[in-house]
């Protein structure tokens, strides 16, 4: 591969390198063919239930909308249907482009700080509002609306109450509890000036491999259908009440329409391959009570139905949702989801609006999308009637919510009432929700409830770990990278146990590794999945693998210590070895900020009442096990859950895994070797092999934290040479690119490069793109410290990489001498600063 020279990048190197903007190295990328529409993805609205409009048209509101639309320019109309992310837009942009909405994505926060204080959120809300209401000639002033993923409380803001994720709330089967959680969440959003949540998720999840399983209430429509109305009424208030959508209430969103939980293989943003009747009967029922409760926005799913993206399916968006169901609010897209429609890109997609989308979620693509959409409106390829209808729907919701007269967010009810954020009443509600969400799966010999006056060992990496306890969508998109100080109004499970035991005069010892000096009366081991969100949580199977905590449980059992396992997870998983090694086993899901609720249950302050919302698998490859299936054969059935009075013994279970342990799909290199399905290749460009000889380049094991957990790569300078991670089969990284994931390397430079160096991602013959590295590596060599390099995948895409068929996730190439040690390479949600690509 002949690599062109590129401009050097500026770099200030510390242990976490901050990268400046860089030039792109581009090699021609072929475009993947676009699939045509499928006849089986054409819904017949007459086959769907019909419903009357929730509200009769309000003549006063409709007249006002008529007046506004008549006074609006074409540019202002186009701006109203575009939503930009606060990480890529300024208040001045909102004013200049007449933008109708902003959002904060999972990794977007005021000032770019994941732990920005609540006051900064309120100040940002005021700034965006003020910009939208600033006089602009004769154009009408239209307030901006700010949307946020408040999916388990106001989870993006430090100090907010964090409720259990939906999977746990599904186990509670308590609609009144759900209503009260909606009310509390709405108030906490109002405190920070936000007026629109992208919740509730009404997914019916049919395959637990899906990375969003924990966002669904269950595997059947039953629970989501019973929860939709009370949760929406908790968030929005009740239709007819004076504070509907106002005062302590906000605007809710029913999502993701439709079939997001039914994709083939549980693949996030995948394809729901099924007949229309199955799509209708399994996945649409929760939307009807949501509409009856007056939900004002519906988010369109990333997924496809029989090969056609929902963002482009007119038969469902317009034919069913708007015409058959008489929905008069607006349809909002998901993160650049319109760009996945056949024939579209993130910056150009009139087809999605024609299909029925009313507001594009265009986080970083908004400016170019504005330009192309305006051109479509001027040319007539986006009919003005469709544009006006989308604008009418958005204005209708803003008028119903009283936003035109509401004043700046800090002046509205609850604005700036920071003492209520994570306040005692809301925390008590969250603790109640934890108590109701836990499911007792095993209780051999009636070990539970425990006596708090005993000598208790608390172990496992989840015991004192609020990051793990709260899961994804917590302060960051993936829920990772947080610290204890980021949770001022929270209690870890260990802290809850310690408080109970201390109050009862007992003794509690925390040791994640399970060490003790005096043999405990009982051990509580808390462990489970690390946080994830969306496709980052997709798995090839549902087997849980954790050699360290399994060994701990077995050692405690061998020592004759009764053991309680508390399992933290976003899905039902195969855990047979852990069940065998435990005397009692509690499915705690992702309980949120109130670890004391777990302690309450372990010590019998309340009896277990949670029932499984998902069937529990008996094998690691039993990924789609749903009640009602012809071959239904779970380990624990849908609706199972013990109480203290039940006989909780469990026969010894088979421990053989159905397949190899699931690999980390984002791991390119780590622990001294390439990730699963990948190879480290070396040699001259075009002549790579696993062992080319040391003439041009060599690789040897190196130590960082453990023996040979890294690799030393040494280029001799005798000629052009490449070190590359190569896929066994081309990888589709398009979802990861759209999701703002990054290629993150950790390396240490022992000898600065003597010639230009390029970091390249490849997608086949004459298809690659990348960036110059020489300046960065030269600076890193001066420090002799471990350096983190993070480059957003979208930068490689901009450089010409076809992200749907990546063959070489990264390669480092130079014709000069270079000596560096590579510790890890991953595709991740970045843990720190990333470079900004031009």
Question: Which sequence ranges carry the predicted segments?
Answer:
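Short beta-strand-plus-loop segments that form exposed binding edges in beta-rich domains
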Residues: 809-817
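N-terminal beta-rich core of secreted/periplasmic extracellular enzymes
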Residues: 33-258, 282-366, 374-407, 432-447
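Bacterial N-terminal signal peptides
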Residues: 12-26
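Extracellular carbohydrate recognition and processing domains
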Residues: 766-803, 821
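Gly-rich Lys/Arg/Thr-decorated short loops/hinges at beta-loop-alpha junctions or inter-strand turns
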Residues: 161-165, 207-212, 261-271, 297, ...
């Amino acid at each position: 591969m002949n690599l062109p020279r590129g401009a050097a990048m500026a770099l200030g190197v510390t242990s976490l390198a901050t990268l400046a903007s860089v030039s792109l190295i581009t090699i021609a990328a072929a475009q993947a063919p676009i699939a045509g529409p499928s006849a089986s993805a054409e819904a017949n609205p007459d086959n769907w239930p019909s419903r009357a409009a929730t509200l009769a048209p309000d003549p006063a509101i409709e007249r006002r909308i008529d007046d506004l639309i008549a006074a609006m320019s074409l540019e202002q109309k186009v701006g109203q249907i575009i939503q930009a992310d606060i990480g890529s837009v300024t208040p001045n942009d909102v004013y200049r482009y007449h933008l109708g909405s902003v959002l904060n994505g999972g990794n977007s926060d005021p000032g770019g700080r994941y732990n920005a204080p609540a006051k900064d959120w309120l100040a940002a809300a005021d700034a965006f509002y003020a910009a939208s209401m600033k006089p602009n000639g004769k154009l009408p002033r239209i307030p901006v609306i700010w949307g946020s993923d408040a999916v388990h409380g106001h989870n993006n803001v430090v100090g907010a109450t964090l409720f259990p994720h939906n999977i746990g709330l599904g186990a509670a089967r308590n609609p009144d509890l759900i209503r009260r959680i909606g009310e509390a969440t709405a108030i906490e959003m109002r405190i920070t000036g936000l007026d629109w949540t992208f919740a509730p998720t009404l997914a019916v999840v049919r395959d637990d491999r899906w990375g969003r399983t924990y966002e669904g209430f269950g595997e059947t429509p039953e629970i989501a259908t019973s929860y939709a109305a009370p949760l929406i009424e908790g968030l929005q208030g009740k239709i007819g009440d004076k504070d509907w959508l106002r005062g302590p209430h906000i605007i809710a969103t029913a999502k993701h329409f439709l079939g997001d939980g039914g994709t083939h293989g549980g693949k996030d943003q995948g394809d729901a391959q099924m007949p229309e009747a199955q799509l209708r009967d399994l996945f649409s029922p929760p939307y009807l009570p949501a509409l009856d409760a007056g939900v004002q926005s519906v988010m369109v799913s990333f997924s496809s139905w029989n090969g056609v993206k929902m963002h482009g399916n007119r038969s469902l968006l317009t034919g069913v949702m708007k015409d058959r169901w008489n929905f008069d609010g607006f349809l909002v897209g998901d993160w650049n989801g319109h760009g996945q429609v056949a024939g579209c890109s993130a910056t150009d997609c009139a087809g999605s609006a024609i299909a029925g989308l009313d507001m594009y979620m265009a986080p970083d693509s908004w400016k170019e999308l504005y330009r192309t959409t305006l051109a479509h409106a001027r040319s007539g390829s986006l009919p003005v009637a469709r544009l006006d209808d989308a604008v009418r729907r958005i204005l209708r919701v803003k008028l119903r919510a009283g936003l035109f007269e509401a004043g700046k967010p800090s002046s509205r009810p609850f604005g700036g009432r920071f003492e209520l954020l994570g306040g005692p009443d809301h925390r008590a509600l969250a603790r109640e929700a934890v108590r109701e969400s836990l499911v007792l799966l095993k209780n051999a010999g009636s070990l539970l409830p425990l006596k708090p006056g005993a000598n208790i060992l608390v172990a496992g990496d989840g015991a004192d770990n609020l990051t793990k306890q709260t899961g994804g969508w917590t302060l960051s998109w993936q829920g990772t990278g947080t610290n204890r100080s980021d949770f001022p109004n929270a209690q870890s499970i260990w802290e809850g146990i310690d408080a109970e035991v201390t109050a009862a005069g007992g003794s509690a010892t925390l040791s994640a590794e399970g060490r003790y000096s005096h043999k405990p009366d009982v051990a509580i081991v808390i462990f489970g999945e690390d946080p994830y969100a969306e496709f980052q949580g997709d798995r090839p199977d549902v087997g849980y693998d954790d050699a360290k905590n399994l060994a701990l449980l077995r050692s405690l059992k061998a020592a004759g210590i009764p053991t309680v396992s508390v399992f933290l997870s976003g899905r039902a998983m195969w855990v047979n070895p852990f069940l065998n090694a435990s005397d009692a086993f509690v499915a705690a899901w992702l309980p949120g900020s109130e670890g004391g609720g777990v302690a309450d249950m372990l010590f019998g302050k309340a009896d277990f009442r949670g029932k499984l919302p998902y069937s529990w698998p008996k094998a690691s490859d039993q990924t789609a096990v749903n009640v009602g299936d012809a071959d239904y054969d779970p380990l624990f059935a849908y609706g199972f859950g013990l109480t203290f009075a039940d006989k909780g013994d469990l026969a010894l279970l088979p421990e053989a895994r159905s397949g190899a342990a699931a690999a980390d799909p984002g791991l390119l290199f780590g622990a001294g070797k390439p990730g699963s399905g990948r190879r480290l290749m070396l040699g001259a460009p075009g002549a790579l092999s696993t062992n080319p000889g040391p003439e041009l380049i060599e690789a040897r094991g190196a130590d960082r934290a453990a023996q040979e957990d890294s690799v030393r790569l040494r280029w001799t300078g005798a000629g052009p040479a490449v070190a590359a991670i190569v896929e066994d089969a081309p990888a589709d990284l398009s979802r990861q690119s759209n999701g703002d994931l990054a290629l993150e390397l950790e390396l240490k430079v022992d000898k600065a490069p003597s010639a230009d160096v390029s970091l390249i991602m490849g997608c086949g013959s004459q298809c690659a793109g990348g960036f110059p590295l020489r300046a960065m590596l030269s600076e890193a060599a001066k420090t002799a410290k471990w350096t983190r390099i993070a480059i957003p995948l979208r930068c490689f895409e901009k450089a010409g990489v076809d992200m749907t068929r990546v063959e070489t996730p990264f390669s480092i190439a130079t014709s000069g001498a270079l000596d560096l040690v590579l510790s890890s390479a991953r595709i991740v949600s970045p843990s720190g600063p990333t470079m900004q690509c031009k």
